[in-house]
Amino acid sequence: MPGTTARRTVICRLDDLNDPDSRGLTLCLDEQLYDVFIVRQGLQVFGYLNSCPHTGGPLDWLPNQFLNLDKSYIQCATHNALFRFNDGHCIAGPCAGDWLTPVPVLVDAGAIVVVHGDFPVAGY
């Protein structure tokens, strides 16, 4: 709706994450639960649903471990698929060419916030 301001939820501070780093969390937005993760790269933050497009399973192999060893890509724990930080595009693995589902996050005055009105799905 034009003129409507989407609600925002602060999920952490930018300084809470190393560069690069990742963090998983469960968000409750409009009474729906979402398993998501965020990735910091420099002053940018990217958010995605924690769901591999190949299997639908979670991407992390341990809590908050979403990145490959040299922290250059998001890596799926199940089949080692690699995804770019900036757009979630899979560049290697069984789901090459597929995309992670983005979660709308931004940095505002040093806080990482998720924007409710732009959330990708109604829940799962």
Regions found by a protein language model. Give the residues of each.
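Short cysteine clusters
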Residues: 52, 76-79
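Short cysteine/histidine-rich metal-coordination sites, predominantly Zn2+-binding motifs
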Residues: 66-75, 90-98
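N-terminal pre-ligand scaffold of iron-sulfur
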Residues: 1-69, 84-85, 99-124
